[in-house]
Structure formats: structure tokens, C-alpha cells
From Swiss-Prot:
Subunit structure: Monomer.
Signal peptide start and end residues: none
GO-annotated cellular components: cytosol
Annotated motif 'HIGH' region, positions: 11-21
Positions of ATP binding: K258
InterPro entries listed in its UniProt record: aa-tRNA-synth_I_cd-bd (IPR045462), aa-tRNA-synth_I_codon-bd_sub2 (IPR020751), aa-tRNA-synth_I_CS (IPR001412), aa_tRNA-synth_I_cd-bd_sf (IPR008925), Glu-tRNA-ligase_bac/mito (IPR004527), Glu/Gln-tRNA-synth (IPR000924), Glu/Gln-tRNA-synth_Ib_cat-dom (IPR020058), GluQ/Sye (IPR049940)
Record lineage: Bacteria, Bacillati, Bacillota, Bacilli, Lactobacillales
Family: Belongs to the class-I aminoacyl-tRNA synthetase family. Glutamate--tRNA ligase type 1 subfamily.
Pfam families: Anticodon_2, tRNA-synt_1c
Catalysed transformations (reactions): tRNA(Glu) + L-glutamate + ATP = L-glutamyl-tRNA(Glu) + AMP + diphosphate
EC number per UniProt: 6.1.1.17
NCBIfam families assigned: gltX_bact (TIGR00464)
Protein name per the record: Glutamate--tRNA ligase
Length: 485
């Protein structure tokens, strides 16, 4: 095996890029880049039933969107898809058959299901029982001939050393070991369709591509002893393994499930909503790893420099949507305005809001946006009917000084010339109302904000009033005063 660090991300093209898979890719990427190694993309497409058209393109496109690059992939190298490597798998399966380390199995799915049912009914752990057990050579030959005559296509099974101990030092979990007798018996390495099973193909691929470290989710721990059996059978050195902890939903404490439709879990979803790739990259990098300290905002280059596999967490990583929203807002607030406006334009255009005020609106709401698509609901005030007040807003507007403030401020706006109606001239008018009425603070600003915008929170009030326009602002004040009578 090479001394150079070589890691891989090996997705199945079965759909969109899930945030858990994105984390696997990202940690492999950070590990390779930190150590000056190679990051490889390999496509594991042996499960033809689950193959999704365009699945590979979607995976690579979303990895690129996140800002990752790679050194080797199906785009630049031949035979980096498992479906292109069948001859290589056959070579090693034939070798194991010739050496007596594997054999052809003619047991049917129906027979396996019946045996499994019997074992469960008897309270036994389900396992494959060697179909040739107790047969003489002649009986075995007759059995095979009969099965072949019936048109039964065999699988190929690896012989399991039931007394063997399969152990490794996991970079995250520490020492782990499995007994060969607990694996479930001889297992299939080649299916009836001639395709290898995952646990066989992945070993051949990792060895052939000289992968030095396998970094993946801890749902693969149970696969590792089977893979170690293949390494042993073929006389190869196994790579180092690191199994990252699972990702849980911070609200439920349960494993993040693709079936949980209340949580956005696919990178494509975040792209469509206008999350910034730098923010999503930063957020995912902290799912099960942190560099220490209080800071949580890091550039891609900083994360590469800081990445330390010894700080991979042993506890589940909590997926917190609110934290991602906070982080994305931090990136949006600090981004160049022209960048944010360019990202916001398609959303405004789709909503029919790409007016001459568009730039000012994006500038006004840039500090508030948790995702770029929020520019549409945030600007409803300027394009839709006045919103229905919440109970909290209604309660506040029931205050006895509210009509006094609104009447005084309406008079101030009416007295302003169109030429003077600018953001910088509106705040002094509010202060003038304070001086005249003696009402200040929340009791001054909140009635004006609610009357003009229908909300208790928002961007700078003078900017909102200016963009709303003099006529519309006065109309909103009059309407509110009428409601308060």
C-alpha cells in the first residue's frame, strides 16, 4: 500500500446528495487536503435496481457547488464506476474459487426465506447454513447437476472462518472486534446477475486504487469485518478505518432520516432556497468535528488547515436547522452586496418584483435574510395587501398613547416635500414627534413600525418608510388610526 494518503468518496447514484453523504465527502476532502493527499470520487453503481438516471451528475454537481474538488474521478479516469470494473471483480472471484476460499451456492431465495423463518421461530439468530453440509463428493455433484438442470443460477459465497477474530483500531471508535461466528455464515460475494456485492467490490476497488484511509459513517461498522475477511482471503493489507458518528435531529434526538420530510436534508434543497455554499460547507464541517475554541465561522481554507482527525467526535452530531440558518445569515450579512443582489434577482423576477426599487430592497433586507429566497416574503409589505396583525401586535396597538404618536407622525410626513422625503430626513421627524409628545422609546417607535409595516421587527424604520413611499406610508397610518377608533 502507498505511503501517500489517498481517500475516497464512493456514492451510489441513487438520488440526490444527502447531507450525511455530503459530510462523508467533506471529511474525506478535508483529510486529504490537510495532509497533501489525494481525494478520489468513485461511483458504486452495482445495485442496478436502485440506479437513478442522472444520479451521478447530481452527486458531482452538488459536491462542486459546495466547493470541493478532486484528484481522480469517472470524469477524468477510466473504470471509476463499478459497472465498468466487472472483469476485475470476476478475476478475483475466480481466484477465490480456484483456491477453495469461495464456492458457488445454488440455494434459492425461497429456501433461504423458509430457513430464516424456521430459525426465528426457534429463537435462533438467522444465519446461512452451508447447503453442502454433510454431503459426500458424489452427493454434492448430484445436487449441483440437479440444480443446474432446473435452471438455477448460482451466487458465489465466501467461506467464513467461524473461529476467526476480525479486529481493527478505528480512528474514531478505538479498538473494535468481531467474531467470525457472529457474521451470519458464508456470505454472497457475487449475485446471480454476475455483479459483485458491495462488501466484495469495495475491497477490490480500495485495494486497486491504493486507498490508505476509509472515512465513513458508523452505519458501515457492521460491514467492516466482512471486508476484512476479503482482505485476508486475497492476502492484501487493509486500510485504516474511521467511522464517524451518526447525525441526529437536534429537536427529536433521533437519527436523521430521509423519511423526515419536515427537515431539509438534501444539498439540492439548500441550493434552491438560496443558502450560500460557503455557509453549508462550514456547517457540515462542524457535524461531528470541531477545532476547539468559541469561533464557529471558518473559511474553506481555514477548515483545511485546522482539520485534525483526532478531534472527530465520539458522540452523535446534532443537525440543528436553526444553527444552519444563523450561520447562513452570518455569511449573507458579510457578503458583498453585488453577490447577494445577483443571487436574489431570480427570486424577485420569479415573483414579479424586479422593479426599480429591487436593489434598495435587497440592501434593506440583506442583514435579515436566513436564505436568499426569503427576499420574497420579506418584501411582501411593498407588493401585497397590508398583513393581518398578530395578537401581540394588536395588544400593543391598544395602548392609549398609540393614536397620539400615529397622528403626530402622519402630520410630519404630510408636511414633508417630495424632495425632502428621504431616509436620512425621516428619523428627525420621529425625534420631533418625541419632543412634541414626550413619548419615547418603544412606545414611540413600535406604533409607527406596526402601523407602517404590520410587523414588530424589521430593518431600519426610516429606510422602510422611504422605500414604501410617502403616499403609501401616510395611507397605512390613516388606515391604522381608523381601525383604532
Amino acid at each position: 500500500m502507498t505511503n501517500k494518503i489517498r481517500v475516497r468518496y464512493a456514492p451510489s447514484p441513487t438520488g440526490l446528495l444527502h447531507i450525511g453523504n455530503a459530510r462523508t465527502a467533506l471529511f474525506n476532502y478535508l483529510y486529504a487536503r490537510h495532509h497533501g493527499g489525494d481525494f478520489i470520487i468513485r461511483i458504486e453503481d452495482t445495485d442496478r435496481k436502485r440506479h437513478v438516471e442522472d444520479g451521478e451528475r447530481s452527486q458531482l454537481e452538488n459536491l462542486r457547488w459546495l466547493g470541493m474538488d478532486w484528484d481522480e474521478s469517472p470524469e477524468t479516469h477510466e473504470n471509476y464506476r463499478q459497472s465498468e470494473r466487472l472483469a476485475l471483480y470476476k478475476k478475483y472471484i475466480d481466484q477465490l474459487l480456484a483456491e477453495g476460499k469461495a464456492y458457488k451456492s445454488y440455494v434459492t431465495e425461497e429456501e433461504l426465506a423458509a430457513e430464516r423463518e424456521r430459525q426465528e421461530a426457534a429463537g435462533e439468530t438467522p444465519r446461512y447454513i452451508n447447503e453442502f453440509l454433510g454431503m459426500s463428493a458424489d452427493e454434492k455433484a448430484a445436487y449441483i447437476a440437479k440444480r443446474q438442470a432446473a435452471g438455477i443460477v448460482p451466487t458465489v459465497r465466501l467461506k467464513v472462518n467461524e473461529a476467526g477474530i476480525y479486529k481493527w483500531h478505528d480512528m474514531v471508535k478505538g479498538d473494535i472486534e468481531f467474531e467470525g461466528g457472529n457474521i451470519g455464515g458464508d456470505w454472497v460475494i457475487q449475485k446471480k446477475d454476475g455483479y459483485p456485492t458491495y462488501n466484495f467490490a469495495v475491497v477490490v476497488d480500495d485495494h486497486d486504487m491504493q486507498i490508505s484511509h476509509v472515512i465513513r459513517g458508523d452505519d458501515h461498522i457492521a460491514n467492516t469485518p466482512k471486508q476484512l475477511m476479503v482482505y485476508e482471503a486475497l492476502g492484501w493489507e487493509a486500510p485504516a478505518f474511521a467511522h464517524m458518528t451518526l447525525i441526529i435531529n437536534s429537536e427529536t434526538g433521533k437519527k436523521l432520516s430521509k423519511r423526515d420530510t419536515n427537515t431539509l436534508q438534501f444539498i439540492e434543497d439548500y441550493r434552491q432556497k438560496g443558502y450560500l455554499p460557503e455557509a453549508v460547507f462550514n456547517f457540515i464541517a462542524l457535524l461531528g468535528w470541531n477545532p476547539g475554541g468559541e469561533n464557529e465561522i471558518f473559511s474553506r481554507q481555514e477548515l483545511i488547515e485546522l482539520f485534525d482527525e483526532n478531534r472527530l467526535s465520539k458522540s452523535p452530531a446534532a443537525f440543528d436547522q436553526k444553527k444552519l440558518d444563523w450561520m447562513n445569515n452570518e455569511y449573507i450579512k458579510n457578503a458583498d452586496f453585488d453577490t447577494i443582489f445577483a443571487l436574489a434577482k431570480p427570486y424577485l423576477e420569479s415573483a414579479g418584483r424586479l422593479t426599480d426599487k429591487a436593489k434598495k430592497l435587497v440592501e434593506l433586507y440583506q442583514p435579515q435574510m436566513k436564505s436568499i429566497d426569503e427576499i420574497v416574503p420579506l418584501t411582501d409589505l411593498f407588493f401585497e395587501e397590508f398583513p393581518e396583525l398578530s395578537e401581540e401586535e394588536k395588544e400593543f396597538m391598544a395602548g392609549e398613547t398609540v393614536p397620539i404618536v400615529l397622528q403626530a407622525f402622519k402630520a410630519k410626513l404630510e408636511a414633508m416635500s417630495d424632495e425632502d422625503f428621504k431616509s436620512e430626513n425621516i428619523f428627525p421627524q420621529i425625534k420631533a414627534v418625541q419632543k412634541e409628545t414626550g413619548i419615547k422609546g418603544k412606545n414611540l417607535f413600535m406604533p409607527i413600525r406596526i402601523a407602517v409595516s404590520g410587523e414588530m421587527h424589521g430593518p431600519e424604520l426610516p429606510d422602510t418608510i422611504f422605500l414604501l413611499g410617502k403616499e403609501k406610508s401616510i395611507q397605512h397610518l390613516e388606515d391604522m388610526l381608523e381601525k383604532l377608533k
